[in-house]
Amino acid sequence: MIDRKYIRLGEDDEDDGFPVFFPVLSVCEEDEDFKVKEDHMQEEMPILALRNMILFPGVAMPIMVGREKSLKLIRYVEKKGVYFGAVSQRDMDVEEPDRADLYDVGVVAEIIRVLEMPDGTTTAIVQGRQRFALQEITATEPFMKGRVKLLPDILPGKNKDHEFEALVSTIQDMSLKMMELMVERPPRELILSMRRNKNPMYQINFASANISTSIAVKQELLEISKMKDRGYRLLYLLHKELQVMELKASIQMKTREEMDKQQKEYFLQQQIKTIQEELGGNINDIEVQELRTKATTMKWSSEVAETFEKELRKLERLHPQSPDYSVQMQYVQTIISLPWGVFSKDNFNLKRAQSVLDRDHFGLEKVKERIIEHLAVLKMKGDMKSPIICLYGPPGVGKTSLGKSIAESLGRKYVRISLGGLHDEAEIRGHRRTYIGAMCGRIIQSLQRAGTSNPVFVLDEIDKIDSDYKGDPSSALLEVLDPEQNNAFHDNYLDIDFDLSHVLFIATANSLSSISRPLLDRMELIDVSGYIIEEKVEIAARHLIPKQLVEHGFRKNDIKFSKKTIEKLIDDYTRESGVRTLEKQIAAVIRKITKEAAMNVVHTTKVEPSDLVTFLGAPRYTRDRYQGNGDAGVVIGLAWTSVGGEILFIETSLHRGREPKLTLTGNLGDVMKESAVIALDYIRAHSDELGISQEIFNNWQVHVHVPEGAIPKDGPSAGITMVTSLVSALTRRKVRAGIAMTGEITLRGKVLPVGGIKEKILAAKRSGITEIILCEENRKDIEEINDIYLKGLKFHYVSNINEVLKEALLEEKVIDTTDIYSFGKKTEEEKAEKVEKTEKKQRKK
């Protein structure tokens, strides 16, 4: 950027009616080179140290003289009328510079005029003449003197150099353009003078002196001898500076336009406000009045009404252009949009409610019975606090979809929020209004969306709530799900109590283990366990197949699935307690048929079991079915996972070893390993009762294995199974055919109850098991299960391990190569033979 160092002289110094400005654009001939004649040079030239400026040949500029030595030099040069040398300092902060503080190249200069300024300072108007090389400083008092060597400025040859002419012209144009972009434009006289000056050296030096860059860069330009090279270097710097100036100008223009726009809008708003006030109101008043009118129809308490009116008065005092206006308006609109005292009318037709539940879901009798009971109480009493129900069970059994059916059967609105992965307490309680972008929590948002205060509210995946430094959402749910507290639920954003006691909350979970105990205590737990194969067949025939046919463009009866086909589909292509994967496999079959129909191929209208391999490929799963058992040490246990029950084979083998050892394999967890250790220790302690010789433990090593080693297994319920397996292996007694068991074992031989009984029973029935051994305390769990699940099963309830072994083991022994007892007898015979040999040796001696 070109520096604006113009000094206006007095009125009496005007020439031809124009004030004189500096730097002065000298009226010079086109070929003038500003050289100094050698005979005009002094042997020792006064040297003036310049701070923060560079003087170029031909350029005139003001120098503010501040240092005492510099003032003496100016007085001396003015009096004698001689030249002096102007050299820039490397560091402007140095007060007493020496040779090392000065650049190597300076400019011979002459004084045009010395001005005494009104503030008492002295300003010298000087003009550069020719460059020189500073050789040495010869004196420092009363001012610096030194020897110099003149340096020529090399112009192109006498023949016209069109490239150089174009270069100079470009520099001149860019300099003028930069003047036009300046915030305060230079005087018109300066611009006109620069346009008229055709001296190439002057044009280059003037632009070099006034470009906005560092002193070091300007000094670099001064030290370039060839004017053409100096011009190209200058052109690069000018181009760079011009880009910056154009960008600044663009930014300033945009800023100015934006400010003008804002001022215009402000004035228009003021005018509109004035006009509306003259007419009797304004926009703000109209909006507030509409809200106040709507508030008269609300069925809210006096506390809410007072709070709303107070917040509305705050809104009235705010200007619509205020940043707080939109925040306050949002809060007021949130209050008035909530369903205060608005309720859906319950449908008390119990038969219709039962038919809706039966239509949408097969089975799940316990859940349906609980909903009908709630409706019956409402019908008799007219009002009651809604229950907090938690449906827990494996995926795909219909827990979430059951909420929709319950809402339809009751005639209520349905809302659902997913809590999976939720880790911020503010998602439940909302954010305080002091935060930017604050809003109410998801509970209040859902009620706002429902439009009633008594919807069926599904809290999906409540067992997958997380917590972090932002808080624990499960703790916030304690207030929501407590019938004694939720009649005054406090949302941080709303800051007003809201009644949730009429909301029917239904939570869903896959497992109860990850839910906090206080939260569990507030909910009524209903086990939605898996379906048996007969139920899955009915669900597929009634719901899944018709649904998928319609979704794929068929009518409900266009394609038939036989019962055996559905059973094979369930057995060979799914492994779940629910029906989600079953629906996917049905959809896959129908897609294949849809493709046939779309290609005008004769498509299948009835799917047989043999067609499944064609449509779905080879069976994905092979069920662990009981095939009979003739081996000692192989016992069937029952396990339970989040996706349902499974049968579990536990195998025990023995092999000879030098020392006793128990080996456990099959990816077992710590609890299951402990069960094996307890089982073996119990057998050792009661070996006499079980008919097992202690010598066996000293000479045989025990290996317990649970197949499917890639799957982690853990839990205490395999305790009695491991005892039975070990006793069978050690005694070689056969295990009763078709029997499975589950239960925990103690060191005293007591059998303790376990969980997941229904899932385990379904797994046993699915695998062809006919008899099950359970703990006596699990009898109550069996009594709660529908008889349809128990058909074909015989239960043995036990309290100790002796009863387990009595029911599970036969007296018949397995005949195989592992002859433990012959090994024991052989050992005794060997000992007797050894003793006899020892006695014979002693007699011979």
UniProtKB/Swiss-Prot annotation:
GO terms for cellular component: cytoplasm. InterPro entries: AAA+_ATPase, ATPase_AAA_core, Lon_bac, Lon_bac/euk-typ, Lon_lid, Lon_proteolytic, Lon_Prtase, Lon_prtase_N. This is Lon protease. Residues 629-811 form the Lon proteolytic domain. Induction: By heat shock. ATP-dependent serine protease that mediates the selective degradation of mutant and abnormal proteins as well as certain short-lived regulatory proteins. Required for cellular homeostasis and for survival from DNA damage and developmental changes induced by stress. Degrades polypeptides processively to yield small peptide fragments that are 5 to 10 amino acids long. Binds to DNA in a double-stranded, site-specific manner. Transmembrane segments: none annotated. ATP binds at G393, P394, P395, G396, V397, G398, K399, T400. PANTHER family: ATP DEPENDENT LON PROTEASE FAMILY MEMBER. One of its GO terms (molecular function) is serine-type endopeptidase activity. Its main location: cytoplasm. The active site is at S717, K760. Gene3D superfamilies: 1.10.8.60, 1.20.5.5270, 1.20.58.1480, 3.30.230.10, LON domain-like, P-loop containing nucleotide triphosphate hydrolases. Keywords: ATP-binding, Cytoplasm, Hydrolase, Nucleotide-binding, Protease, Serine protease, Stress response. GO terms for biological process: cellular response to heat; protein quality control for misfolded or incompletely synthesized proteins. It comes from Porphyromonas gingivalis (strain ATCC 33277 / DSM 20709 / CIP 103683 / JCM 12257 / NCTC 11834 / 2561).
